[in-house]
From Swiss-Prot:
Assigned protein family: Belongs to the acetylglutamate kinase family. ArgB subfamily.
Protein name: Acetylglutamate kinase
InterPro entries reported in the protein's UniProt record: AceGlu_kinase-like_sf (IPR036393), AcgluKinase_fam (IPR004662), ArgB (IPR037528), Asp/Glu/Uridylate_kinase (IPR001048)
Superkingdom as given in the UniProt entry: Bacteria
Length: 255
């Protein structure tokens, strides 16, 4: 089976000119089939403030009301996505920017109201893996924004880690997939204050122990839970690493 690397990047990596330039150079240097998934929450918060729209967060997750949905659609599907595509094209990478609405690539259901009403947020229900694989086999490099649709005419804000995980699981039917989650740290850390304390490998037993000890906490827990869901669905391996090391295989390998 042919190999494919799917990389998810977020935070300041895609929103600061110098870090984005370095990321795109490193991504362009990866040989073979590849997909890039990006976030953009900081840019969305900044634009919302400029427009006088309050950004509401609960447990680190954005509440997406009707006005906020307009902002994230503009920022994720427009500003951030097209800056990445333009940068990759300049490096000779035939990138194509997509949201889940394009060609019905990714359909979601609006998240039901529970303890918190997250608004226009989507939980992915269907990925058009055949279409995505067809684009990839044509030499196109998909750049996926964290937006889906409900096929009823509505866009939905969708977590970028979820987009990456669902795309990787769907593509595992067509490729041997390596899924990489990239952020500012070098990997999963034993000590959050020591950037060199990278845990090289984590299996399920170790993960459970680290959570119980409070070593792994916060946003890293759902990231690792997504990783194990991807592995269960056929993804070959998951790596959590720093964006500057995506072509070196460093970081934390999850298995």
């Amino acid at each position: 089976m042919e190999k494919l690397v799917l990389i998810k990047v977020g935070g300041k990596i895609v929103e600061e000119e110098e870090t984005l330039r370095q990321l795109l150079n490193d991504f362009a240097a990866i040989e073979g089939y590849k997909v890039l998934v990006h976030g953009g929450g900081r840019s969305a918060t900044k634009l919302a403030a400029q427009l006088g729209i309050e950004s509401k967060m609960v447990n680190g997750r954005r509440i997406t009301d009707a006005e906020t949905l307009k902002v994230v659609t503009m920022v994720y599907g427009g500003l951030v996505n097209k800056n990445i595509v333009a940068g990759l094209q300049a490096l000779g990478v035939n990138a194509l920017g997509l949201t889940g609405a394009d060609m019905n690539l990714m359909r979601s259901d609006k998240r039901p109201v529970a303890e918190v009403d997250y608004g226009f947020v989507g939980d992915v229900k269907e990925v058009n893996a055949d279409l995505l694989a067809s684009l990839i086999h044509q030499g196109i490099v998909p750049v996926l924004a964290p937006l889906t649709h409900d096929k009823q005419g509505h866009m939905l804000n969708t977590n970028a880690d979820t987009i990456a995980g669902e795309a990787a699981k769907a593509l595992a039917k067509h490729f041997e997939v390596t899924l990489m989650f990239c952020f500012e740290k070098k990997g999963v850390l034993l000590d959050e204050n020591d950037d060199e304390s990278v845990i090289p490998e984590i299996d399920r037993i170790a993960f459970k122990g680290y959570v119980e000890q409070g070593i792994i906490q916060g946003g890293m827990i759902p990231k690792l839970e997504n990783a194990y869901q991807a592995i269960d669905a056929g993804v070959k391996q998951v790596i959590i690493t720093q964006a500057s090391e995506i072509h070196q295989g460093k970081g934390t390998r999850v298995f």
